Amino acid sequence: MTTFYTVLSWLTFFFYWLLIAGVTFRVLMHRRPVTSTMTWLLIIYILPLVGVIAYFAFGELHLGKRRVEHARQMWPSVVAWLEELKKCKHIFAKHYSDVAEPIFQLTAKRQGINGVKGNKIQLLTTCEDSLNAITRDINNARDNIEMVFYIWQSGGLVEEVTEALIQAAKRGVKCRIMVDSAGSRSFFRTNGPARMRAAGIEFVESLQVNLFRFFLRRMDLRQHRKIVLIDNYISYTGSMNMVDPRYFKQDAGVGQWIDIMVRMEGPVSTTLGIIYAFDWEMETGERHLPPPPDNNIMPFEQANGHTTQVIASGPGFPEELIQQSLITAIYSARKELVMTTPYFVPSDDLAHAISTAAMRGVDVSIIVPRSNDSFLVRWASRAFFTEILEAGVKVFQFEDGLLHTKSVMVDGQLSMVGSVNLDMRSLWLNFEITVVIDDECFASDLSIVQYDYIARSTQLTLDEWEKRPFMNRVLERLCYFFSPLL
């Protein structure tokens, strides 16, 4: 019996270290930021079994066999569709402003199409304005309505959107809605989805979360885009979920969420449409490619139209493109750079680009909420404040709610608006969307909103920051340790 237990112990010991060695090799063979690799290795060695389970659940980007197969099957059709779109040469811009040209060159190289011109873009600065505008456009829809949101929650003005969708479906408009399973889990416990499906709306739960899928697909990979498409002509995107902030997370203690959206008319809606079609087919297996732009209704030739590029991220899209675009925009800045984000946990490359911009004389401002709904992110973000404050970056802490707006404005000319947070999850993992707009008037509108945020904020100075308690510094560093995983 003693021999049996001895052999069993040695076999356990052997397989244990074989498992650790195998997972270590797997971690090292995946290309990722060094800080992320080191963090995973430390977790695996400090908490071996827990670390191994956590790594296979959250450490690798895998969609699941079914979605991978859908993506593989549809890619040739997407490529063919893009080639057809390129034949509409009059919709593509040939010239950009000096500050915008580098980012448009980058995105054209990585995505295969240039920016599109002749768009009409309106900045919607409150959730009330955004929800009312969406409802009006739904009421006027004739052909199709497509939406994707991370969070959908009933209450307030969202009920008007829902009722408008139901009435649109009843009059024959094709309605397809996709919402994230984790972000909208409370909504799926209500009769809301069933009510819309009964009206003829296709309502899909994206990236479903349950115990049986835990090891089949990465659970923290989320559908974080916010897109509305109407009649292949009108589109919306931005930071707002399908929620009325007066009824959303009122017990979180952070105040109402503050968001912006952009309403767009023109060929940019077609480029958003192919992204939605990709997501829909990956989730359902159904193919609904958008039609090419209609020459009779698209405002191609408007001299004052906005030049726009859409950047998408997530599995199946060009890797790291949103981070590359952000860094390119930052290095293009010569006078002014203003950024708003609810979660500031940047990669080292992004943090260094921001600091370098300030050190070379650019007026850099970052606006973040004083309080947000994530304990880890709140403290991890503060670990970056010393570096950027010492470089001369102005840090403003928004006092009037949870500032959820994700925006970038460069030199009063280049703007970026979308769903992307300045954290590792948005930059490296989730399905995200950002629109890049090369237009002085739009940048002026955005800067007015950003400076309104600053007026409702408190500036954090380096002297004040260095006086924070020692335990705060310890907590910041502990949370910073996990920043590559946030």
From Swiss-Prot:
Location in the cell: Cell inner membrane
Domain PLD phosphodiesterase: 219-246, 399-426
Active site: H224, K226, D231, H404, K406, D411
Statement: the UniProt record of this protein carries the keyword Repeat: yes
Catalytic activity, reaction form: 2 a 1,2-diacyl-sn-glycero-3-phospho-(1'-sn-glycerol) = a cardiolipin + glycerol
Keywords: Cell inner membrane, Cell membrane, Lipid biosynthesis, Lipid metabolism, Membrane, Phospholipid biosynthesis, Phospholipid metabolism, Repeat, Transferase, Transmembrane, Transmembrane helix
PROSITE patterns: PLD
EC primary class: transferase
Record has Repeat as a keyword: yes
Cross-referenced InterPro entries: Cardiolipin_synthase, CL_synthase_A, CLS_N, PLD-like_dom, PLipase_D/transphosphatidylase
Sequence intervals crossing the membrane: 3-23, 38-58
One GO CC annotation: plasma membrane
Superkingdom of source: Bacteria
Main localization of the protein described in the UniProt heading: membrane
SMART domains, alphabetized: PLDc
GO biological process: cardiolipin biosynthetic process
Enzyme Commission identifier(s): 2.7.8.-
Topological relation to the membrane, as annotated: Multi-pass membrane protein
MF (Gene Ontology): cardiolipin synthase activity
Function: Catalyzes the reversible phosphatidyl group transfer from one phosphatidylglycerol molecule to another to form cardiolipin (CL) (diphosphatidylglycerol) and glycerol.
Similarity-based family: Belongs to the phospholipase D family. Cardiolipin synthase subfamily. ClsA sub-subfamily.
Name recorded for this polypeptide: Cardiolipin synthase A
